[in-house]
Every structure is written in structure tokens, then in C-alpha cells.
Amino acid sequence: ENGFEPEYVTVRGKGAVIASLKKQAKTVDDVLIATDPDREGEAIGFHIAQKLGYQTDDGERFRRVRFNEFTRDAVTKALENPGEIDMLQVDAQQARRILDRLVGYGLSPLLWKKISPVDPVSRRPLSAGRVQSVAVRLLVERERERRRFRSGSWWDLLATLGADGGEFPARLVKLAGKTVATGRDFSPDTGKPSDEQEVVLLDEPTARELVARLEDESFVVSSITSKDFKQKPYPPFRTSTLQQEANNKLNLSARDTMRVAQRLYEAGHITYMRTDSVRLSSQAIGAARGRIEEKYGPEFLSPSPRNYGKQAKGAQEAHEAIRPAGNQMRTAEELGL
């Protein structure tokens, strides 16, 4: 209807806030919009500016300032280099809100009918969202796949061998010219090896018989193969990986993680915590390398910094990854946290 053009109305009880902002805006030469540096922040800033006269003749006095951290340097730089409201970001946020409603208004009544209109624990109204509805579908498909799975059983033969005062683990991989079956050889549909002619399946009697035969045998290392490998560090935190790590290490929910991150951001300890980016500024990289050299020594510094420049499709490119704010990379102890 009407080309999906949304109609925005003032939240009940907030008229006085808008009236106050309008009154104050008339007393200044410039209005600086410093809402959060993401799509939602851009849209909020745009709607505030609209209410204050952004699209009238004096719209040029409305300037957008963006910063990813509450530090003196970041805020000062943003104030010295104001920009314009990014209408592409505003349109992107608006499209997402419209899609939320197109999906939610259609699916939520079905959710209420089939499950419940409210959460049985919190008693909050339930709704079906654009993202979580698809996620639930993926979970259902995965559960159906799990239920179709047919388990199988097999035995491994493991040993601890010793040589020159040292020990190392060993595993039986071949028997009578055939490869000993492992989990990767089984079909999830049958619970049996996919190619029973190519592998030998150890059952318990066979495995125990082999143990009895080999217990007193001597073994010879026929060859040694050495391989180099590199273990790359994980990329810097973005919102999703921060939530995952906080859950794995601290057992925090996504909501609790974001609540703590919001407080750290507002206190000037970390950069903005809602980001898809793994990019770090040159200032941050220099600060991190300086701290490593100071604390651990130059031998622990890589010859050149590792850059994570590629972004996921649709990522909010202007953002940095989540990192300690400022250019000193102080520890929690140094900050008194």
C-alpha cells in the first residue's frame, strides 16, 4: 500500500522532549547530530533532524558527527570534521524496519495460534521476527536431519609406545591390507560403513583379540614425516564473535554481553560494540604493537601487522572492530576495572 511508504508518529508521552529540542535548536547556529555510528543511529539522527527542520531552508546548519569511541581525540576529531547525514544508511535501516513488519505481522498470529501469545516464563508478548523465524526454520531442518541419523559402533585400537625414554601415541590404521574404519567411513543413513569392501570394521571381540596378540610385541618406527603448520590468530571482535566468546568463556547471554559492552563503551573503555567489521585503524594497530613491544619485547612483534580488510557482504564498512578505546591499550587492572 502506498509503495510501502512508512508513516512515522511520535511515541506517546515524548512530545515534550521534541518540543524542548525544537526550542533549543532555534537558539543555536548549528545542530550537530551525534547519534550512534550505525544504521539505527543514522536513522534516529535523521528523524530528529527532520523534526527540527532539517528539510527546510536552514537544513544546512544540521551536521552529522560520528565517532566510534568516547575518547578526547576521537570526539575532537569528529567535531572538527562534521559530515552529512548518510541517506543510504537511513534508507537501509528503513527497509529493514519495513521487512520486519511485513514478516512479523504475517507470522506472529500463526505463532500465537500454534504456540502461545506470551512467553510462559516472562509473560512478555511473543512475536515472529524477520531473522529469528528463518533461524528457527534452520534449527528445525537440522533437528529433522539429526532424527534421520542412524548411529553405528566401531572400536579403535590405541597404544602408547615408548622409545629413548619418551612416549608417543599410536593408532591401528590398517589390518590385513585394509584401512580400519573410523567415524568418517560411516553413512549417516544406514549406520554402516559406506564401502564395506574397502575397510575393516573392528568389533569388540576382534579388538580385544588384537590387544592380546600385540601386547608383548615390539614395534619399529619405519619413517618419520615432519610438517610445518601455521596457526593464525582469530580476527578482532565484531558483535557476533564477542557474544560467542563471552558465552564460551564467561557463560554470558548475548543480552548480558551487550549490556556490559554498552557500559564499557559509554565509559570510554572500548569502541562501538555493534559492528560487522574486523578492521582496525592504523592508530589501534600502532598502539597494540607498541604495547606488545613494551610488555613482551620486540622479538614477539611480527615483521608487519596483520590486516583483516575483507568484510562480509552488507557489513557496515566505516566501523572498526571492537577493541580497547584510545591509543594506549591499557589493561583492565590499569583502568581499575
Give short role names for the model-derived ranges:
Residues 1-337:
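Toprim catalytic domain recognition across nucleic-acid enzymes
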